[in-house]
């Protein structure tokens, strides 16, 4: 019998997963999985639980939570030689990674069905400073809002909490001097932010990295150069439509490796969570983890 381990964050997404847990377990049992669960209790717990489950040779590990929970599970699996297949049940606020995979984000039971009936494909992940990420890494004051927003506010307001925090931060945004090397090229200058992405879905923007691929061995690198408040707002508005990539303030390109040096303190954002401080070198790990996705999405990757 196949064995599945569900690692879930009991506080994610208005604490809704706990209410559906019995039904989710029933679905997996009916699909032929011997299924057990682990409820996370603190930061880093999902990483430890994922590593432990992998060493116990579970066939499938399901991360049920937000992008931060998925990131922790990936960090438990990525360093191992034998990595179980990863399934995702999105229960967070933004759910960027699930959006990129085409996994239902509004219905936990439909997401569970996708994990059961979907297809596993190997996808790229990123590594920087000994840590792993599966969706996005970045730096710049605005990228910090994803972990500056209190958990209780996210639980109450959902995505709106991020918009409110972003509006609050806008007047205080200022550029930072950086040096960014990417595949033999060099950018030196002041930036508002930079993003190293693996999917097209970033911070709820579905077209921020429109050329991204889950399995091409390349990051999408986006650099927003120094801009005043009006220019910044204009670029952000264009980003909703994916039209920002041709703007004069934007560098948008593909890269397998990205090295960032900073002249002043800059925090590192990994999948929406605090990832320490820069500098850092971002390395793309080609098709490193098998992830379950809808059959239609898998067919797109196969083309």
Curated annotation (Swiss-Prot):
<keyword id="KW-0594">Phospholipid biosynthesis</keyword>
<keyword id="KW-0067">ATP-binding</keyword>
<dbReference type="GO" id="GO:0046872">
    <property type="term" value="F:metal ion binding"/>
</dbReference>
<keyword id="KW-0444">Lipid biosynthesis</keyword>
<dbReference type="GO" id="GO:0004143">
    <property type="term" value="F:ATP-dependent diacylglycerol kinase activity"/>
</dbReference>
<feature type="binding site">
    <location>
        <begin position="66"/>
        <end position="72"/>
    </location>
    <ligand>
        <name>ATP</name>
    </ligand>
</feature>
<keyword id="KW-1208">Phospholipid metabolism</keyword>
<protein>
    <recommendedName>
        <fullName>Diacylglycerol kinase</fullName>
        <ecNumber>2.7.1.107</ecNumber>
    </recommendedName>
</protein>
<dbReference type="InterPro" id="IPR016064">
    <property type="entry name" value="NAD/diacylglycerol_kinase_sf"/>
</dbReference>
<keyword id="KW-0808">Transferase</keyword>
<feature type="binding site">
    <location>
        <position position="218"/>
    </location>
    <ligand>
        <name>Mg(2+)</name>
    </ligand>
</feature>
<dbReference type="Pfam" id="PF19279">
    <property type="entry name" value="YegS_C"/>
</dbReference>
<comment type="function">
    <text>Catalyzes the phosphorylation of diacylglycerol (DAG) into phosphatidic acid. Is a key enzyme involved in the production of lipoteichoic acid by reintroducing DAG formed from the breakdown of membrane phospholipids into the phosphatidylglycerol biosynthetic pathway. Is more active toward long-chain DAG compared with short-chain DAG. Is not able to phosphorylate substrates other than DAG, such as monoacylglycerol, ceramide, undecaprenol, phosphatidylinositol, or sphingosine.</text>
</comment>
<dbReference type="InterPro" id="IPR045540">
    <property type="entry name" value="YegS/DAGK_C"/>
</dbReference>
<feature type="active site" description="Proton acceptor">
    <location>
        <position position="273"/>
    </location>
</feature>
<feature type="domain" description="DAGKc">
    <location>
        <begin position="1"/>
        <end position="132"/>
    </location>
</feature>
<keyword id="KW-0547">Nucleotide-binding</keyword>
<feature type="binding site">
    <location>
        <position position="216"/>
    </location>
    <ligand>
        <name>Mg(2+)</name>
    </ligand>
</feature>
<dbReference type="InterPro" id="IPR017438">
    <property type="entry name" value="ATP-NAD_kinase_N"/>
</dbReference>
<dbReference type="InterPro" id="IPR050187">
    <property type="entry name" value="Lipid_Phosphate_FormReg"/>
</dbReference>
<dbReference type="InterPro" id="IPR001206">
    <property type="entry name" value="Diacylglycerol_kinase_cat_dom"/>
</dbReference>
<dbReference type="GO" id="GO:0005524">
    <property type="term" value="F:ATP binding"/>
</dbReference>
<keyword id="KW-0460">Magnesium</keyword>
<feature type="binding site">
    <location>
        <begin position="9"/>
        <end position="13"/>
    </location>
    <ligand>
        <name>ATP</name>
    </ligand>
</feature>
<feature type="binding site">
    <location>
        <position position="213"/>
    </location>
    <ligand>
        <name>Mg(2+)</name>
    </ligand>
</feature>
<keyword id="KW-0418">Kinase</keyword>
<dbReference type="Pfam" id="PF00781">
    <property type="entry name" value="DAGK_cat"/>
</dbReference>
<dbReference type="InterPro" id="IPR005218">
    <property type="entry name" value="Diacylglycerol/lipid_kinase"/>
</dbReference>
<comment type="similarity">
    <text>Belongs to the diacylglycerol/lipid kinase family.</text>
</comment>
<feature type="binding site">
    <location>
        <position position="40"/>
    </location>
    <ligand>
        <name>ATP</name>
    </ligand>
</feature>
<feature type="binding site">
    <location>
        <position position="93"/>
    </location>
    <ligand>
        <name>ATP</name>
    </ligand>
</feature>
<dbReference type="GO" id="GO:0008654">
    <property type="term" value="P:phospholipid biosynthetic process"/>
</dbReference>
<keyword id="KW-0479">Metal-binding</keyword>
<keyword id="KW-0443">Lipid metabolism</keyword>
């Amino acid at each position: 019998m196949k064995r599945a381990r569900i690692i879930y964050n009991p506080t994610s997404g208005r604490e809704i997963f706990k209410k559906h847990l019995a039904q989710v377990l029933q679905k997996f049992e009916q699909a032929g999985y011997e299924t057990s669960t682990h409820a996370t209790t603190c930061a880093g717990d999902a990483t430890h639980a994922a590593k432990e489950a992998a060493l116990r040779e579970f066939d499938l590990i399901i991360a049920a939570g937000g992008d931060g929970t998925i990131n922790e599970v990936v960090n438990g699996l990525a360093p191992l030689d034998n990595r179980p297949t990863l399934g995702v049940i999105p229960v967070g606020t933004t759910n960027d990674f699930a959006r990129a995979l085409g996994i239902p984000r509004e219905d936990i039971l439909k997401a569970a069905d996708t994990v059961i009936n979907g297809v596993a494909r190997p996808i790229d992940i990123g590594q920087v400073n000994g840590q792993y990420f599966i969706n996005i890494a970045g730096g710049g004051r605005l990228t910090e809002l994803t972990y500056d927003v209190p958990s209780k506010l996210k639980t109450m307001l959902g995505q709106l909490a991020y918009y409110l925090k972003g509006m609050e931060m806008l007047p205080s945004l200022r550029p930072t001097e950086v040096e960014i090397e990417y595949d033999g090229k060099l950018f030196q200058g002041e930036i508002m932010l930079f993003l190293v992405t693996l999917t097209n879905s970033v911070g709820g923007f579905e077209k921020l990295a429109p050329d991204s691929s889950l399995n091409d061995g390349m990051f999408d690198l986006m650099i927003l150069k120094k801009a005043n408040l009006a220019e910044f707002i204009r670029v952000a508005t264009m980003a909703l439509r994916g039209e920002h990539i041709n703007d004069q303030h934007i560098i948008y390109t593909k890269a397998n490796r990205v090295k960032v040096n900073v002249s002043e303190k800059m925090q590192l954002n990994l999948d929406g969570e605090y990832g320490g401080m820069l500098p850092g070198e971002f390395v793309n790990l080609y098709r490193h983890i098998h992830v379950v996705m809808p059959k239609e999405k898998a067919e797109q990757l196969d083309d």
